[in-house]
Amino acid sequence: MADEATRKAVSEIPLLKTNSGPRDKELWVQRLREEYLALIKYVENNKAADNDWFRLESNKEGTRWFGKCWYIHELLKYEFDMEFDIPVTYPATAPEVAIPELDGKTAKMYRGGKICLTDHFKPLWARNVPKFGLAHLMALGLGPWLAVEIPDLIAKGLIQHKDQNS
């Protein structure tokens, strides 16, 4: 299960109420509003705790999301582009976050750079539909994945800090 800091961070993210995906145009607007409010609250909380680690934005329809995430290791910032699409069956199905530049560098990743969240995150998501949203995906999915995988990839020499490449 999650550590105490993660539990605290997640407990401060507003739960969502609208059970709607992109196919339901009217309710989807309401769901998106809730998603943005939860994401804003999560980012504000992270900044207040000096734990700011991602930026995220979407297309106009809220169906394609993209941004940057980063991980600090030994005082060096490793930054990655990330992207995901909202599944048509959302929120019953969690989005699959991709970090394309890490594709093929870890076994905990699917083709196209989609991170593997099957064992730990997806059952938790399924138990919390429709209350969980994109902020929860970041807090309980991508964040822990980065914390485990990035130090391992650095130790194996599979990724290097951008300043070490010059």
From Swiss-Prot:
What positions does UniProt annotate as the active site of this protein? Answer: 116 (glycyl thioester intermediate)
Protein family (similarity comment): Belongs to the ubiquitin-conjugating enzyme family. UFC1 subfamily.
Biological function: E2-like enzyme which specifically catalyzes the second step in ufmylation. Accepts the ubiquitin-like modifier UFM1 from the E1 enzyme UBA5 and forms an intermediate with UFM1 via a thioester linkage. Ufmylation is involved in various processes, such as ribosome recycling, response to DNA damage, interferon response or reticulophagy (also called ER-phagy).
- Which is an annotated GO molecular function term of this record? UFM1 transferase activity
Which Pfam families would you find in this protein's record? Answer: UFC1
Name the keywords, alphabetized: Ubl conjugation pathway
Q: What is this protein called?
A: Ubiquitin-fold modifier-conjugating enzyme 1
Which GO terms of type biological process are on file? Answer: protein ufmylation; response to endoplasmic reticulum stress; reticulophagy
What is the annotated quaternary arrangement, including any partners? Interacts with UBA5 (via C-terminus). Interacts with UFL1. Interacts with UFM1.
> What is this protein's gene name?
ufc1
